[in-house]
Amino acid sequence: MTERLRTVVVGAGAIGAALDAGVSETPLTHAGGYVAAGYDLRALVDVSDNLDAEAAKWGAAAYRDFGTMMQEVRPEIISFAVPASVRASLMLQALEHDCVKAVIAEKPLAASLDEAIALVAAYKAKQVPLIVNYSRRFVPAWQGLVGANAISATIRYAKGIKHNGTHAIDLCRMLFGECLSQRALSGKTDFWNDDPTVTAFLSFERCPEVILQGLDESCFTLFEADIIGPDYRVIVDQDGRRIRRFSLHLEAGIPPGRRLVKESEQDTGAGMAVRNLMQHVLAVCQGERPLCSGEDAIASLQIATRLSEGYQQSQTFKQWSVFFEAHQ
């Protein structure tokens, strides 16, 4: 990097700073990503008890007040890795300072769709690039599948349709184009009280049948995808680290016929996602369009909101049905 831009991470929790034990070639955190990519990590901002230890680990200053940090550090790039409930207000404060060249936000972008729309509009008005960290956008194996036509896809997830579910929705938009329709089938509350995990059926431009299969985060953590095309199949599992590819063979199997046969098993490159993100930020500062923009985040959150509302409406209908049956 020819220019060591000043960077700051707001949020010293797991994805902000804590998951990495220190400097790594394959960082998991925003702090680790900035250091690995050669940026000048100036500060961490948080109100938690672990702030001082995390800041010391990265050789950065510790701030408990965002406004003070902005005045003293004048960061050029900021990562917001705090909960969605407080993220939008801090991101708007950042726009009051002309030092900011780009911002990275964790997902979901905001606590509500209206808040996200207002936030993106504010960044657009100030002409400050906004990158949303839907991490699969920065994984080589997924990037290699962009534009593919598929017959069907199944993605298994848990921990909320707006939180982890939007990872799946954004992935489908990246691979298959815009969503044409969506319908909630069932759901459960497995982690967030205000964000159910919804099982849903969706249709996209290049994949007419997508099943989001909602699991239960209280049982285990899982996110995997199974995509089937006219002459191929791709399975990504093992925390997104493994990709298995199958291709069409004639006269294969018993009895002989047209079958999908495993061709390869490889690492997806997911371990480089954070570092790729940080390298992408520099390109965005130089004029490149973000791989995942605020508009992309809004599109996924819109779909997730419709699915959440659809599920909640179905639950209300069921409750009223039970009530009327009981009083007949």
For each predicted feature, which ranges?
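N-terminal Rossmann-like dinucleotide-binding module
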Residues: 1-57
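C-terminal helix-rich "cap/oligomerization" subdomain common to oxidoreductases
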Residues: 1-5, 53, 77-82, 280-328
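Predominantly a Rossmann-like dinucleotide-binding segment in NAD(P)-dependent oxidoreductases
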Residues: 10-13, 129-192, 314
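Short acidic-hydrophobic, aromatic-tinged amphipathic segments that line or gate anion-handling sites
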Residues: 61-66
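Rossmann-like NAD(P)-binding element
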Residues: 69-89
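Beta-strand-loop-alpha-helix segment that lines the small-molecule cofactor/substrate pocket
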Residues: 76-77, 88-134
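Contiguous beta-strand/loop segments that form the cofactor/metal-binding neighborhood of enzyme cores
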Residues: 166-248, 267-289, 304-308, 322-328
